[in-house]
Amino acid sequence: MDEAAGPSTSRTSNLEDVDDEGASLAEEDEEHTKALKAKEMMAPLFQRYNFTMKKNDLPINWNKPEILDKIRSNAVVVLQGATGCGKTTQVPQYLLEEAFERKEYCNIIVTQPRKIAAISIARRVAQERKCDLGTLVGYKVGLKEQHNEDTRLLYVTTGVLLQSLINSKTMATYTHVILDEVHEREVDMDFLLIVVRRLLSTNSKKTKVILMSATIDAKGFSEYFKIPKKSGYLSAPVISVERPRLHVVQEFYFDDLEKLKVDFQIDYEAPGISEQMYNIAAKLVVVCDHLKGQEFGDSLEYKPSIIIFLPGINEIEKMEGALEKLIASIQNAAQRPNLLIMKLHSTLPADDQTAVFRKPGPNQRKVILSTNIAESSITVPDIKFVIDFCLQRILVTDTLTNFSTLRTEWASKSNCIQRAGRAGRLMSGRVYRLVDRRFFENNMDVSTSPEILRCPLETVVLKAKLLEMGTPPSILALAMAPPNLDDIRNTILLLKEVGAMLRTVKGNYDQLDGDLTYLGRIMSKLPLDIRISKLIMLGYIFSVMEEAVTIGAGMNVKNIFLNQNSVKTYSQKMYWADGSGSDAIAILNAYTAWKSRQEQAGDTADMYNWARRMSLDRKSLIDMAELIHEVKDRLNRSGLKPVSGPNRVVWNAREKTVILKVILAGAFYPNYFIPMSVGGKELMERQSFTELGGRDPCNTVFFTGFDHERYIGPLYTVQIKKILSEGDYSKHQAMKVMYDRTTNRIFVTFLGTTDERDQRGSFMPGKVHADVYRAIKLRKLGARNRITEIRTMRQRDAIDYATSAGLGHWEDANGWVPRRKIVRNAHLSVLPPIFREKVVCQVTHVVHPNKFFLRPEDNRNKDIFREIHTQLNARQLHPFPADANFAMGQMVAAPVQENQETYARAVLRSYRNVRTTGSVSWTVFFIDYGHTAAMEETAFRQLDDSLGQLKDIPPRAFEATLTEIQPSAIISPQGSWTTESIHRFKELVLGKIFVAKVYSVVGVVASVELSRDEIRMNSELIRLKYAQYAEESYISKLDHDHRERKQREIMMDENLRNEVYRSAELTQNTYEDDELEDVNPPEDKLRCKVVLSGPHSPLETSASATIRSSVMKPVSIESDSVNSILLDSNPQDTHEKLLVAGGVNEQGNRLVLRQTSVMPNIPGFGAIMSLIFCPTAQLKKDKDETRVVTVLSGLGYDPSTGEALYPEHDMALTLDVVLNDDDITNINALRYTMDSILHTGEGQTDPKFGDASIQKLKLQVKQYIIKILEHERRFLDLRHAPNDYNWRCDLNLTAGSSSSKKMKGDFNIYDKKAIFPLLEPLNLLPVSASQLTFLKKHCHELHKLAHTDVQLPRHGITCQLCNNVLETLPQLRIHLYSKLHRDRESQIKYRSPQMY
């Protein structure tokens, strides 16, 4: 918060000067001297400004004498007056005028709860006094301020005054402190009341305090400021200002609505709205619309409005539905109301909110469905009818878990009265409260519970520490409504967890207190949530502070993205996330783009349209820009700013993405969630294979509920595509729809260019096609709208139409038989056959290391390719006629490269119309090379006459991928290959001859290992740090197992080998033609309807919490998050992934995650982040103490009792990678370096080290984090330690042990002042010789069993090495190929026999 709120210090304007100069005088002359000096200081102001004001007719003026008299004779006065009576603008001016009349010194400060109110009121008062704003009257809110040495009336926000008093610890500089809107009881106001009361009784006894409230109950404030007298305590006087109503507003209650009511009783024990109540409110709207306006003396030219107060957005949607349903049911058009239904809530863009002020059309009535935003923030003047459900939704924080819950409760009477005040401004009106009168009068609370009793207390406790007037509990006990001691204790624990407080006070552990750290002081200065402040400080440590400030500001303001609940806005969110899977990075990218465009275009209509088109809320972005400016200014004043110069830390763009995710994991620890699939990864892969019929789950979704015996699928392909493309026909070419008659499923595979990700596009990290995410989002959004309904033909009509369209034919015995396609010359296919282990190939084209093309270099294939090339280029080819029609899948001759005369075979893939030329451009695929190109139809040549035979020769190149590798998560955080890695791979392989060892062939893609000159390209890319290991998919392992066994059989049986070779030469395949032209049956034939279920994906997952208090709770992600659709983006990888949430809300028993980020696909990332950023950790070993199996992190335990200090937030992460001594050493070095940057000297409040030293430390931070992230870790099977959450089970590993001190040595200099104390050494034991012998023998038996065809026992067998249950022989064989098993074999130094 701002360190000062008053005007700048000046010898002509500050009362402190009077105190100083008069201090040496005799006590009896002091008051006289002060009065003389004050008169001398104020005299120039009295001459420069007008201190008399024209009288107005505001209600407050009737009370002016009483107000001034009470203020003069009392230290504290409570002024109660309804909104609009004039108290905010007039009372401070009364005091100015009185000071002028009495020639006395004055310095008045007035607080407002909101920035906009402080500025607008200051501007209005300056206008009334006819002075320039910033002179006699000024304001100060955040970084915005207008005041000077003349200012005697200063409007500020509550927080500004609070921070000023905390810093100065006196109010003596002010003659009057006016606290306005005290009835709102926000946290800052309640704490300010504590400070004001404390200072009044100590060093500021002469300052007058005025509390102004709009509530009907000011007694509480009066009692709080009791003054001790000889006869007892005297409460502060209360002055009530009455405001006469200009228009009559009648009040009605639920029990007054007899004509509308069904036999229905409200359940007052369960606040909420039932379906009957929605219907009653809808009927009430119709009744109001029929009431004659003349009864109320209306003067408006249009129908006045109705406002309905509802507790939340969900209720607004339901109320809208009830109104629409009722209106549709009214048959008589004359009786049917013409309603303009408008929504009003805080998540709407500012432009949409202002729409409620527009006039309705002729004979139309506006019905506003609003949350409590219309109580005070927004006033619509033309309201006649108020319908109030008397409900509110308040945010309540469970301090034990730190999760917030939006709870629906009955509103208070004061809330309801304020809502009623929306009517009667321009005309008479009516208020309908949908509760019984008796309940309203006798059971509803007078006012809403103060925020301090239900909201987070972190900032309050930090301010209490800065106040230095006692422990946080002792200070907060002085509050008007003291928080529960348990809530204070839990808040202190939370502050210790985030590093704002130490666990000790002057070296001694204290459960209810702790020394404030430098990190905590910075948190107290920033107007942000403490975790966001920590994010910024970690950004400072990791040299990404600029980005951290932007992300933090975006998280703190209202959502900068328009939340329109559509696939379009979801796609835009993906676009802004740029493949990061992070809401935080989406904020950074969106703001950066907006800021850049704003600087170029300014605040223009084009800028407005661009923001809407890109699903951005312009008002929120402007607020975000202001907050960024304010945060940077406060950081600068604290000496924290990005370092410039040659020695600064520099991250490239891709490294920065990873580092931003690292600091997000640090700032929002312990909000860690593990995406999980039911039954584990291996089971999920097997199910994906089964559910999709062997299709790729990364680009395929499916629908169920399609009866293939009744319907002919290809007739409805266009409708299926329409559903998934939301009517965008340009996307139809990129979808392939298939029908499975055995499962009654429809499969849709998304084609397209997901490989080229150099340009920013809408995609997610990992291998899953973005359209799969969009399809699942479509299902979740459209569940209510039945988007998967398709129209079908009657069977007889369908058979006739499909037969005439050439889609197949009908057989009485078999039903519909689809058209089949013959694969000619299949024996000439270049795809490696099952018996071929290695192929000598040339690399003809490279997209990236997981997609390139190979052409076999054996003599036969070379001859075939040469013959094709010769035939196409030895003669003049004929162009197509100008009126030729082309079709997808058609083969033509096309130039291999632009402006060249060399032709090759090409297949037409997709087309688009070129607007500028009016021609058609096709994407063509060169089947003998592997590359694609875009060209116009005029470039095509015919394959006619003798060249027609070329159409029957299979492609001479096949697609391949490097086995068991994927992009490095460090340099490719989006999971896509970088331009640099692709360029290097091309340099290494393009045009060169390699030996390709075939691992598997899935579909038409071969997974291979490329070798040349004893260099294995797969390993080489890992060595160059472009790639990391990747598990092969289940279907790839399945094919690999089949190939290995078949090749072994062939090797052992010469007759079988000859038979296999011979059959390969005779192969002639047919398959169902799935490249049919889309057909669109006539509308009049589509007379039936079928509702499908879907689309579904077998990759859909849920997340699981990791902290102790939440492990059993279901988890969902907020609907506008980029991760609202959570899929297993790398299904072949078996290690656990990590999802970090910026915030967690609780809905019933369910956790809802906000501002989520998918962490990099680095094995063990969650455990590593926990070890880096946790307060302390314990490394739990297995029973033999040979390996670490669990990382237990949290605040630790009480050394005297062994009990956990904060058990609800203890986190136990099971390790699936090997953690060794190098890891702990590097993590400790990083923790120590972070501590050094944040460390303050003894008795100091600023960092101990200077800028030059801190810069060196930041360079060390970069070195350590890169070393930690790049460290390759072997896989481990998941095993749980006994008593995972028990801190007492292994006291040898706890902080402070002798072994710990020995290991830490000289590095333990921070001792109990460390925010990141060093972790303990591993001290692991070697695996015993007997155990090694047993495991090796077990492995030998597994391999031996894999060679057989025996059936496994009923419940399967367990791999003792990996702790995996294997139920079938294929599962066993595939498991033996897994990286987990191979790593475990390597760890016990077992050499497996040659694979079968």
UniProtKB/Swiss-Prot annotation:
InterPro entries, per the entry: DEAD/DEAH_box_helicase_dom, Helicase-assoc_dom, Helicase_ATP-bd, Helicase_C-like, P-loop_NTPase, SNase_OB-fold_sf, Tudor, Znf_C2H2_type
Helicase ATP-binding domain location: 68-234
Database matches in CDD domains: SF2_C_RHA
Positions with a binding annotation for ATP: G81, A82, T83, G84, C85, G86, K87, T88
GO cellular component: cytoplasm
Stretches with biased composition (Acidic residues): 16-30
Known catalytic reactions: ATP + H2O = ADP + phosphate + H(+)
GO BP annotation list: cell differentiation; meiotic cell cycle; regulatory ncRNA-mediated gene silencing; spermatogenesis
All copies of domain Helicase C-terminal, residue ranges: 292-468
Segments for region (Disordered): 1-34
UniProt keyword Coiled coil present: no
SUPFAM superfamilies attached to this UniProt entry: P-loop containing nucleoside triphosphate hydrolases (SSF52540), Tudor/PWWP/MBT (SSF63748)
Location of the motif DEAH box: 180-183
Primary localization: cytoplasm
Residue span, Tudor domain: 885-950
Record's subcellular location: Cytoplasm
Any one GO MF annotation of this record: RNA binding
Coiled-coil segments on the chain, per record: none
Family under the similarity heading: Belongs to the DEAD box helicase family. DEAH subfamily.
Role: Probable ATP-binding RNA helicase which plays a central role during gametogenesis by repressing transposable elements and preventing their mobilization, which is essential for the germline integrity. Acts via the piRNA metabolic process, which mediates the repression of transposable elements during meiosis by forming complexes composed of piRNAs and Piwi proteins and govern the methylation and subsequent repression of transposons.
Protein name in the entry: Probable ATP-dependent RNA helicase spindle-E
Organism: Culex quinquefasciatus
Gene transcribed to yield this protein: spn-E
